[in-house]
């Protein structure tokens, strides 16, 4: 496929995902405690749970999940530019943090959570809105009882690499206090 065909396919796939998703919203912390990480994403893709609002803020969305893998699609735009006229490194970092973190999340059991301990980002090529879409794919390297690692890449529709990252995530038991089950902050 040439680049225009890939872009057209990615746009079509994005629309199919958007048609199934609820409006982005913050999910109450305790709402997903009875689900595995993979079940959370299955519920998001089925329109039963909302996707996180960060994707709406930075114009990216989850496209596909399987255990140990998470794929996001982003639209780099002028609103993401830094003073040099290219996409800000924070946009790359947030997109890749989502991909690698969610790859880890897909492997978690009921009652488990995670947080990013470290994110190492390498931006290897400048990005502008001349590239209409990019994909970020996160893949798990290792999942243990307390620590997980994953790697990710951002590529354009022509297959060019724009950035890559690794993460270390802390895995923990979700607290189950009465205030959390009532929607509080715990």
Predicted regions mapped to residue ranges:
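Terminal targeting signals and extreme-terminal segments of soluble enzymes
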Residues: 1-186
């Amino acid at each position: 496929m040439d680049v225009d065909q890939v872009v057209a396919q990615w746009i079509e796939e994005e629309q199919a995902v958007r048609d199934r998703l609820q409006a982005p919203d913050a999910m109450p912390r305790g709402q997903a405690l009875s689900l595995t990480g993979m079940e959370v994403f299955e519920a998001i893709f089925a329109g039963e749970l909302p996707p996180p609002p960060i994707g709406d803020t930075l114009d990216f969305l989850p496209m596909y999940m399987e255990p140990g893998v998470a794929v996001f699609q982003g639209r780099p735009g002028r609103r993401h530019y830094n003073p040099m006229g290219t996409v800000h490194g924070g946009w790359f970092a947030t997109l890749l943090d989502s991909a690698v973190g969610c790859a880890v999340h897909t492997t978690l059991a009921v009652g488990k959570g995670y947080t990013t301990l470290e994110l190492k980002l390498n931006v290897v090529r400048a990005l502008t809105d001349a590239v209409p879409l990019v994909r970020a794919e996160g893949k798990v390297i290792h999942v243990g009882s307390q620590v997980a690692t994953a790697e990710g890449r951002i590529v354009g529709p022509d297959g060019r690499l724009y950035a890559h990252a690794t993460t270390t995530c802390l895995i923990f038991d979700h607290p189950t206090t009465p205030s959390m089950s009532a929607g509080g902050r715990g």
